[in-house]
Amino acid sequence: MAEAAAASTAAPAVIGGWTKHVTCRYFMHGLCKEGENCRYSHDLSSCKQTMICKFFQKGCCAFGDRCRYEHTKPSKQDEVPSSKPSMPLTAAPLAGTPEPVSDGPGGTTGAQEKPQGSGAVDWVNAAEFVPGQPYCGRADPVLCEGPGPLIEEEYEKEQANKEMKKQLCPYAAVGECRYGLNCAYLHGDVCDMCGLQVLHPSDTSQRSQHIRACIEAHEKDMEISFAIQRSKDMMCGVCMEVVFEKTNPSERRFGILSNCCHCYCLKCIRKWRSAKQFESKIIKSCPECRITSNFVIPSEYWVEDKEEKQQLIQKYKDGMGTKPCRYFDEGRGTCPFGANCFYKHAFPDGRLEEPQPQRRQNGSNGRNRNTRRTHLWDLLDERENSDSFDNEDEEMVRFELSEMLLMLLAAGTDDDVTDSEDEWDLFHEELDDYYELYL
C-alpha cells in the first residue's frame, strides 16, 4: 500500500515535468486563461523568436499596431531556414570543387588548410534545398552588366500590372471604409459627379467608363426633373383637380390622348370613354375639342411635345407587344382587331402570326366598306327564319354582337373620319332593328 501511494504521488510530477520546458503559446500572445495553474512554461526568456506577421510583409495587415505578431521585415539571413550542423562529406567531391592535394607524405591536404567558414562549400544552404528558389546549379557565378536594366524594366512592368489588378474597395466605393489605410483593397479617387471613391488611380478605361455612366445618369435625372416641373401644375379637364395633388397616389397619372393635347387624369378619361349613355363617336372624342383619339396612353408625367408623344406612343405599343393577346390565345382563338391589335400574336412554338389581307368591297357611295358585318347579317337572317330561341342562343347572339363591335372598332382606324361615322351609324341601325324584332 505504501508503495502504491508513493507511485501515485510521484505520477503527476512525471507527467507534467516535460511540459514545463515548453513555452505556452497562449501566454506568448497574452491569452492564457489558466494563469499559474497552466502546466506549460510562462518563461518568455526561453521561448523562440517571435513570429513575423506575413500580412505585414505583404503590406496589408488589417490589425496594425494591435497585431499580435511582430511587424518587422526579416533580413536575408532570417529568410533562410535554420539548418543543422554540416556533416563531413564522405561521398565523391562535388562538381566544381577542387580535390584535396597532399603536400607530401606527412603533410596536410589543401582542403584541410581551408577554414570551415565562408570558404567551405555549404551544401545544406544550396539553392536546390532552399524552398521557393530556382535551381541554379553549382557553377561559379558569371557577372554580366547587360541584363541589369532589362530586369529592372520587367520588374517595373510587373509592379504596374499588380497595381492594375488591385480591386477597388467595395466599402469605400459606396461610402466609408472602416479599415482606412490598413485596407487590403485599393481606395479609388473621388468622382466629381457622384462624390464616391470609385475611380481607379491607374485604369484609364475604368475611369472614362464610370464618368460616362455618371453623365448619362445625370442627364436622366435632369429629364425627370424637367418632367416633374412641367407636370406639377397640370389640371384635369374633367374633375378639375391638379393631378399631382390627388389624395390617392395611384390616381396621380395622366391619360394622354393620341390625337389631342388636352390634359386629363387617367381615371377620368377612362371613365369618360367607358360611358354607355353616349354614342361611340362621342366617347372616343376629346371632351373639350371633340377630336377623335383611338386610344389612351397612361403616363406618369405630362407630355405635350409631338416628338415626346410619339416616343411615348411607340414605347407604349412596344410594351403591349410583349404581352400575349388573350383573344388570339396562341392560335386557338380569333382576335377581332387583327393586325391592328397592340398585343402579341404568337403561336406556342414562338412563330408570329402573319398579317392577313383585309377583304373590302365598294359601297354605294364609292367608298370602301368592311365585309366583316356579313356574319352579323347571316345571323340576323337565321334568326328571322326561326321561331324562337332559348337563353343559350341569346348569349351566343350577344357574344357575336360584341365581337362585331370589336371588329368595327379595329376597322375604324383604317378609314377616314367620315367613313368611320358611316360604319358606326350602320352598326347602330342594325342593333336597333335587332333589338326591336327579337329582344
Curated annotation (Swiss-Prot):
Alphabetically ordered keywords of this record: Metal-binding, Repeat, Transferase, Ubl conjugation pathway, Zinc, Zinc-finger
UniProt feature coiled coil, ranges: none
EC number: 2.3.2.27
InterPro entries referenced in this protein's UniProt entry, alphabetically: MKRN-like, MKRN1_C, Znf-CCCH_4, Znf_CCCH, Znf_CCCH_sf, Znf_RING, Znf_RING/FYVE/PHD, Znf_RING_CS
Pathway: Protein modification; protein ubiquitination
Zinc finger feature spans (RING-type): 236-290
Superkingdom: Eukaryota
Catalytic activity: S-ubiquitinyl-[E2 ubiquitin-conjugating enzyme]-L-cysteine + [acceptor protein]-L-lysine = [E2 ubiquitin-conjugating enzyme]-L-cysteine + N(6)-ubiquitinyl-[acceptor protein]-L-lysine
The keyword Cell cycle is annotated on this UniProt entry: no
Region Disordered, residue ranges: 73-118, 352-371
A molecular function (GO) term: ubiquitin protein ligase activity
TM spans (from-to): none
Region (Makorin-type Cys-His), start-end ranges: 191-218
Zinc fingers typed C3H1-type, residue spans: 18-45, 48-74, 163-190, 319-348
Function: E3 ubiquitin ligase catalyzing the covalent attachment of ubiquitin moieties onto substrate proteins.
Record-given protein name: Probable E3 ubiquitin-protein ligase makorin-1
Gene: mkrn1
